[in-house]
Amino acid sequence: MYDNLKSLGITNPEEIDRYSLRQEANNDILKIYFQKDKGEFFAKSVKFKYPRQRKTVVADGIGQGYKEVQEISPNLRYIIDELDQICQRDRSEVDLKRKILDDLRHLESVVTNKISEIEADLEKLTRK
């Protein structure tokens, strides 16, 4: 799993926290950030440079002229797909944790209100 990332020398893809991608001249710059260890101020990161792929395409659709366009490298596209899988999984785990905590807080509030209601009923019975 994550063969493209492993081919870059990333031995523990599960430690990836996030990534950034920017274009610089004729290159795409991929920067991968790893989870911070306790006591670290900055996350560890690695940077990779990919030349943009050049293609010549028909400029106007009629066949009168051609123009050169640049696209992201196919290898980089595969790497980004793997990074998206990792980062999306982390996001969904965080969302699930948030949902569970919200449900727990709601349950706590319902139980607290029910206890107050029962105590009030008991108080009414003891006054008689």
Curated annotation (Swiss-Prot):
Coiled coil: none annotated. This is UPF0325 protein YaeH. InterPro entries: UPF0325 (IPR020911). NCBIfam families: PRK13677.1. It holds the Pfam family DUF3461. Belongs to the UPF0325 family. It comes from Escherichia fergusonii (strain ATCC 35469 / DSM 13698 / CCUG 18766 / IAM 14443 / JCM 21226 / LMG 7866 / NBRC 102419 / NCTC 12128 / CDC 0568-73).
